């Protein structure tokens, strides 16, 4: 309210209204539409027609299924309100309860349900990559910070290259190194004197995808931590030298507490981004072995043999993905708000 008291309300509205309208049109409205669609069954009304198909050797009549059009030439949609049926079809609680009652928590049987198979990989991918990104990013920042000034610029540029590369292109580059007669695959085969097929099993592809995400995202953590190191109080560092503190003690008691808010920031960004893993599956052509929640959304939006898209299920999967992101962020956000209140007191 202090800002509003310093200026007229009309002036305040003039400054804030564009941002507010942008948030409504590009965030709130699409989200509301997706929520509504997740409770609906949307499908084109189809009918069969005879169509003559000709080639250099003659013509023949074939029967094809096409969408039914109205008088204005638009597709006629079959929209039904189905409540939580889309969520039920995705989560399959009945099938899950039957598996648990008959075989207990048998992961081999539970992962036969697409959603839980995708959820397992999404969570594994998200939480396994996080500590590597934080630790490697901090180590790189500390090493670069210790370099002489002449070397810092070139090293920073080289370190940021993986983050600059488009994700799909980066994934394809890693794939080409290991697939078939790739450079690294050929080298390993020569070294071990046996054939290697890294892309023949899901676990090896998954390891490559984890490696790629760490390689691609670590530069982001590095540049954030490196910028934070420039703001560390040098007087505290000098005082720690006088007190006889070693490098590890300076890191633990001075540097990490100082950059802790940025560690939380990097963690939040990574968790939100990694939970929506999609580029790696496309780049590594891994959809036959591995699926994620974001891939499920894309898969539902692809045309089936009848020319339909499962928009309702895709919307439901998107909402479940958003709920999952909120759940994994809650502990970090609670800790952040708690620390902020303590500082204010």
Task: Show the residue positions of the predicted features.
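A structural signal for multi-pass alpha-helical bundles of membrane permease subunits
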Residues: 4-345
């Amino acid at each position: 309210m202090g800002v509003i008291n310093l200026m007229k309300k009309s002036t305040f509205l003039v400054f804030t209204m564009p941002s507010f309208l942008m948030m409504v049109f590009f965030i709130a409205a699409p989200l509301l539409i997706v929520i509504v669609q997740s409770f609906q069954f949307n499908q084109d009304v189809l009918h069969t027609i005879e169509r003559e198909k000709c080639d250099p050797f003659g013509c023949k009549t074939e029967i094809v299924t096409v969408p039914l059009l109205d008088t204005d030439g638009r597709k006629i949609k079959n929209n039904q309100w189905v409540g939580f049926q889309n969520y039920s079809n995705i989560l399959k609680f009945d099938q899950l309860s039957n598996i648990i009652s008959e075989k207990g928590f048998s992961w081999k049987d539970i992962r036969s349900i697409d959603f839980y198979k995708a959820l397992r990989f999404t969570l594994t991918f998200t939480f396994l990559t996080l500590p590597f990104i934080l630790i490697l990013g901090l180590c790189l920042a500390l090493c670069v910070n210790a370099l002489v000034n002449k070397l810092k610029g070139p090293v920073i540029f080289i370190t940021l290259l993986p983050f600059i590369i488009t994700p799909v292109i980066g994934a394809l580059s890693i794939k080409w190194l290991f697939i078939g007669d790739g450079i690294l695959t050929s080298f390993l085969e020569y070294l071990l004197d046996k054939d290697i097929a890294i892309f023949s099993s899901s676990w090896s592809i998954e390891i490559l995808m984890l490696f790629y995400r760490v390689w691609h995202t670590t530069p982001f953590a590095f540049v954030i931590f490196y910028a934070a190191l420039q703001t560390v109080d040098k007087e505290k560092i000098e005082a720690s030298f006088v007190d006889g503190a070693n490098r590890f003690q300076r890191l633990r008691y001075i540097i990490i507490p100082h950059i802790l808010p940025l560690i939380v920031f990097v963690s939040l960004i990574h968790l939100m981004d990694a939970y929506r893993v999609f580029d790696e599956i496309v780049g590594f052509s891994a959809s036959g072995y591995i699926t994620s929640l974001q891939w499920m959304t894309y898969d539902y939006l692809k045309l089936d043999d009848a020319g339909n898209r499962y928009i309702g299920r895709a919307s439901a999967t998107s909402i479940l993905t958003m709920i999952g992101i909120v759940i994994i962020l809650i502990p970090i956000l609670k800790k952040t708000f708690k620390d902020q209140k303590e500082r204010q007191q």
